[in-house]
Amino acid sequence: MIRLDHVTFGYGLQKKVLRDVSLEIPEGGRLCLTGPSGEGKTTVLRLLLGLEKPRRGTVSVPEGTAFSAVFQEDRLLPWKTALENVALFSDGETARRCLAALGLSDSLDAMPDTLSGGMKRRVALARALAHPFDVLVLDEALTGLDGGTKTQCLAAIDQAVGHRTLVMATHDESEAAALGAEIHYI
């Protein structure tokens, strides 16, 4: 069980982004954070990943939990091909399979600067899906994808997650519905 218990957080002297937030995510659960921009969805994900520390409250994650994540920025290594970017955290066969599941079989040897924005998003997603994980964290991972590509990606995410845990932030509640995720408004 992953827990946020009465968490309060703010950046620097800025107003509090999160105020007394409590969440429980059971092992194998699927949770979607949604709400207006700037209300703390990404911050909750960063707290779960240990990238930020709360001002007050506690974040509890079982020891040894392996995370894999896709952030709003794709962060591909520009000197590596699509396949090499995905294979950083997996074997070549798993990387190929994940890229194929996301419709990128023809782009294995492409360099990031030759890929469209949507293709870069899918390479970043393939990298996260190929990495061994207990919890998959997606921060607006499907933003900017067309409807057909988004549907293909949702199917790949659903299959890859299986009975493991998914925590995602999105403005598109249909993504949560497609993945059977409980919706939590922030």
Q: Model-found features: residue ranges?
A:
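Q-loop/switch helix immediately C-terminal to the Walker
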Residues: 80-94
